[in-house]
A protein has these predicted regions:
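Extended amphipathic alpha-helical segments enriched in small hydrophobics
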Residues: 104-109, 114-125
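Short arginine-rich
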Residues: 123-133
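Conserved beta-strand/loop scaffold segments within soluble protein domains that form the structured core
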Residues: 1-103, 107-110, 132-146
Length: 146
């Protein structure tokens, strides 16, 4: 499951749930977000691996980047594992565009807004490649407006 969000204002609440009920199942949940202005995003993800779902393989990850000192993001990734023989992982990170990164790009002639756009593009590009062509094109168009 791939989830992507952009926001400049308002509050976004995103919830995902993945359920493994059978043996030898596989899931990857990847959530990425870019927040600017005074936007707030809260993500809650749950992966449940039921008893009997031996050899299930599950991963749940959320990553958000903040472009404004007023933007906020929170994430609660959760695993509920009721079977012993599984592979399961989860994680979440929220970070901001660093002044060092902006300075580095400024010394190479990039204005601040273009530098932010490049950093966000780098943060998302490999992820965008996972989307179907039409959606990837729409995402890149939206990125050009950041």
């Amino acid at each position: 499951m791939l989830c992507l969000f952009f926001a400049k204002k308002g509050t976004l609440k995103l919830e995902t749930e993945v359920l493994h009920e059978a043996p030898d199942t596989f899931s990857r949940t990847i959530v990425k977000g870019v927040l600017d202005g005074n936007a707030v995003a809260n993500y809650e993800g749950l992966v449940t691996i039921k008893k009997g779902a031996k050899n299930a393989d599950a991963d749940l990850n959320e990553r958000a980047i903040l472009l404004s000192p007023h933007a906020r993001a929170g994430a609660i990734p959760r695993l509920e594992v009721l079977e012993n023989e599984v592979k399961a992982g989860h994680g979440a990170t929220v970070g901001k565009v660093g002044e060092d990164e902006l300075f580095y790009l400024a010394t190479r002639g990039f204005p601040k807004n273009e530098a932010k756009r490049l950093i966000v593009r780098g943060f998302l590009e490999a992820f965008i490649e996972e989307f179907p062509v039409k959606e990837a094109k729409e995402i890149r168009t939206a990125l050009s407006k950041i």
